[in-house]
Amino acid sequence: MSALVQAQLKNFKGMQMRSIGPAVTSGRVTAIDVNQQQGIMYVGSASGGLWKSESWGTHWTPIFDEQVVSSIGAVKVSKLHPDIVWVGTGEGNPRNSQTSGRGIFQSRDAGKTWKCMGLEETKTIHRICMDGHDNVYAAAMGSAWGPNPDRGVFYYNVALGQWKKILFVNDSTGCADLVMDPLNDQKLFAAMWQYERKPWNFNSGGKGSGLHMTVDGGTTWKRLGEKEGLPKGHLGRVGIAIAPSNSRVVYAMIESKVTALYKSEDGGANWKMVTDKGVGDRPFYYSEFYVDPANENHLIYLHSIVSESIDGGKNWTTMLPYYGVHPDHHALWWNPTNPMEIWEGNDGGLNVSRDGGKNWEFIPNLPLGQFYHINYDLQVPYHVYGGLQDNGTWKGPAYVWHSDGILDSDWQELYFGDGFDAIPDASEDNWVYLL
């Protein structure tokens, strides 16, 4: 940071920030994990930091605001010591608006204090796994905008207190997904993904992409391919899910010439294509799917909508359509002790179902709105304008004359969809230009 910027920041040191809204919507949820022993939830967002609830979603507290980054890619609670929480920063879905991170963080007191544990140049950490000794595996995607060597799978040895890169392909290939066998913490699957975001297009896939498996905690890896039943040719992004009730059943959503769902019934040794119907909605962006903790054939697939299969992925029906809750879904926590309870995160915030997905409740008090740009006009009192990711463009007052303070009713939605820039006309109060 330049000396000039630092000097300017000193002028604002004594100012207190205040929220002016709007509170009519939430924003993009990217990660969910739960300390079930104490009923503590952690929810990460694309640019709104990490939030904690000790009341199963009734009340929320921001616990990451003092850190150098607010984009969350992964959150993992230790099963051995539930007060230990790891957070990977950087959003793991690199569209045009992808937000980079600054490494991986650890809290040893349930989010009260944090320490950066390294991997600052990985840009995006989308998955974290922990073994039975609290050693950590981190899936680093790397920079979305060009080659960099800080990609792949990293292993943190708690006893030694240091990181080791245990899976690396090349400077353009990162790890987009990482799952651990629930019955064998030495067995992991890593989805390596070659990709690059450019201002004018996006390259997804290449010779670096592929599905890798280890059975010795990452000391050695085997790349799975056509011989094992996976598609030939260059692959794109791969999403992986292991059935908790039967870890020999493994699913993979594979972006390729024909994007399809694949299944292994022998722990990943051999694979067969299940279907290419009802899957593959923008696979570079949507690769999240989950298996019912109690039923190996019951799957939920997150994409523009939420789809459900009860026959091992052969057929899909709509669980959540475009209406009812916000579309574009990215995160899910399926209660392992009560599969009827499902928490789901999307571009509009957090939702919960307590009847297996038949009915859903929106969690209204998570202020995660992701503003791309803000502006203001010259009225008195002046108004603030902002374009929200997938939640419209809004106009609201900086302050009001009535005693109730700024209310949701004081805000006006100017346009729907993805909001970006709003430029008020300085000479005409009623004119605003939108991008």
Language-model features: locations:
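Beta-propeller blade termini and top-face loops
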Residues: 4-435
